[in-house]
Each structure stands twice: as C-alpha cells, then as structure tokens.
C-alpha cells in the first residue's frame, strides 16, 4: 500500500502513521500490512507525537506494520527533524528509510529502544544523517531482536556529538542483532565508539566499500565487543584519520578479516590496534581531496572506499 503524504502535512506523529496503517488493514482485512509513505521532496517534517499529558512523545510504528519512509524524487531529499525518537516496539517484518535526510533536533537518539521488539530488517538507503548527539541505534531495555541492520549508500556526519554514546550501541544482554551490514557509505566524524556491544552480533559485522574519517574519539573504540565473539569483516574500505592518537581499535574474541582495504598513516589506534589492518604510508590528506571540509574524493586511483568518492576516470 503506497500513500503519498499531502503537502500540507509537516508533522509525522502516531496519528498520521496509524491512520495510514488502519486504512491498509481495513482494505486488506489483515493485521500485518506493508505500507510505503511517500514524503514530498524538499519538505521538512517534524518527527514527534504528543502524550496524553500534552508532552512530546516518541513516534511509534503500529504493531504488525512494515513501513517504508520513502523520499520522493525532486531537487532535494525530504528532511526528517527528529524531535523525539522512533519506537520500534512490537513485531515488524521491516522498517525502512529511503532517500531522506535525518537530523537530531532534540531526539538525541534515532532509536533508543526500551520495550520488546522483533524486527526483520531495519534499513537506511540513500540517506544522510547529521548531528546526532547520541546513537542511531541503541537498546536500553526490553527483549529486542533484529535480524539485520543495513546502512547502504548513506553519509553520516558529526555523529555521537555529545561524546556519551556510540553510533551503534547494543546496550543490553537481551538484544539479539543477527547482522550489521554497512556498505557504500561514508562515516565522517564520530565522537565516541563507532560500535559498542553488550551482546555479540551473531552473524557478525560486515563493512564494505565505506569511507571513514575522523573516526573514533580518544579512549573510544572502532568496535568494542569486549569478551564477546563478534566477527568483523572489512572489504574495499578506507579508514582515514582517527580523531585522537589515544583512540582504540577493535576488541573481540571473534575473527577479524580485512580484504582490499586501506588504512591511512594518521589512523592511529593507541591501543587495541587492528593488527590485521596495518596503517599505510599515505596520510588522509594524501588520499582524499579536502577531508577537513568533507570532500573525500580520492586523489589516488584505487577504487576503494565509498564509490561516491572515486576519482573520475
């Protein structure tokens, strides 16, 4: 079921989503429905609901609904200003975001899950993220299972700005994330751990064709799977400068596999270094065109990292 939001709608709350879901349920006679919400190009939406006492509340996906938030084609992506978090409680085959710009305007976390949830796929495709104070995905309570988190063709800039929480944070032992897959994406400036786990990711973390810069703050980890077996696979990826020489690499009892990838000379991990992934002789400034100003176009001919930055042939 595809529904294009009327241009007059500028706030997406529980009522807006529930009305679309209810209409689809009535039309199909089924509880479990799949809907695509078309968002107007260039439109800015405030993502917030209202609690019974009148205060701001999280935006909830109704039970049984699988939802795609889809940015319609146009001059610019629709902007989702997250005033509060996304609540994924309940059972959902998938929750997807496609071709949208995501901003933290008060939510701190995109997802800060404290209630039971079972999700097949949580995915972000062709999206930009900027200025999130804390995590994109955090679990803090309840029993949460997600088969796969996918980030594809995205750019995340200035993440974990508060310095208190990782970008991806499995924060409870009652979380079962089977797979974390990051591909064709850029991660520019992370002011905490990039990945931190209190429960292993059973199917591992796969990072392919990605570009990292200003990755990981001092004393924080690229991936912290302490005393847990989470396999890490990195393919055709460029690790640019670390934010601090006291940044840390990876700790896991799982395997670390590196293929066809490059690590800049100024990607320094003062401890827990990724010994399978030695730093090369080139600095970030020698690899990228103007990394300090977010231009990661490759100066070198290697076709690795996020494909959007390949040197023109």
What are these regions (language model features)?
Residues 277-313:
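C-terminal accessory segments
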Residues 1-4:
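Non-catalytic propeptide/linker segments at domain boundaries
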Residues 34, 42, 72-79, 100, ...:
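Extracellular beta-strand-rich, repetitive "passenger/adhesive" scaffolds
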Residues 38, 46, 68-70, 81, ...:
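Extracellular beta-strand solenoid repeats
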Residues 66, 93-104, 119-133, 145-161, ...:
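Right-handed parallel beta-helix
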Residues 8-66, 74-84:
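N-terminal extracellular ligand-recognition/capping segment immediately after the signal peptide
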Residues 47, 58-110, 284-286:
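Right-handed parallel beta-helix/beta-spiral solenoid domain characteristic of secreted/periplasmic
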Residues 51-58, 79-88, 104-116, 131-143, ...:
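Extracellular beta-strand/beta-solenoid scaffold signature
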């Amino acid at each position: 079921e595809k529904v294009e939001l009327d241009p007059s709608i500028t706030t997406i709350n529980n009522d807006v989503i529930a009305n679309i879901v209810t209409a689809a349920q009535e039309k199909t006679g089924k509880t479990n429905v799949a809907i695509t919400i078309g968002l107007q190009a260039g439109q800015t939406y405030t993502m917030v609901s209202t609690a019974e006492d009148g205060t701001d509340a999280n935006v909830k996906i109704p039970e049984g609904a699988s939802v795609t938030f889809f940015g319609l084609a146009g001059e610019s992506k629709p902007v989702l200003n997250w005033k509060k978090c996304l609540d994924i409680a309940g059972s959902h085959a998938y929750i997807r975001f496609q071709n949208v710009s995501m901003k933290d305007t008060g939510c701190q976390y995109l997802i800060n899950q404290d209630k039971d949830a079972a999700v097949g796929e949580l995915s972000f495709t062709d999206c930009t993220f900027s200025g999130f104070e804390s995590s994109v995905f955090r679990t803090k309570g309840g029993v949460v299972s997600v088969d796969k988190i996918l980030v594809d063709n995205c750019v995340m800039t200035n993440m974990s700005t508060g310095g208190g929480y990782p970008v991806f944070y499995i924060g409870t032992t009652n979380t079962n994330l089977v797979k974390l897959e990051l591909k064709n994406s850029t991660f520019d400036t992370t002011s905490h751990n990039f990945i931190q786990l209190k429960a292993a990711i059973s199917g591992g973390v796969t990072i392919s064709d990605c570009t990292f810069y200003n990755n990981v703050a001092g004393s924080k980890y690229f991936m912290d799977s302490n005393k847990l077996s989470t396999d890490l696979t990195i393919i055709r990826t460029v690790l640019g400068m670390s934010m601090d020489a006291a940044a840390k690499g990876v700790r896991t009892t799982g395997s670390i596999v590196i293929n066809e990838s490059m690590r800049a000379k100024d990607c320094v991990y003062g401890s827990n270094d990724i010994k399978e992934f030695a730093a090369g002789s080139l600095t970030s400034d020698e690899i990228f065109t103007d990394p300090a100003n977010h231009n990661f176009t490759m100066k070198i001919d290697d076709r690795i990292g996020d494909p959007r930055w390949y040197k023109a042939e």
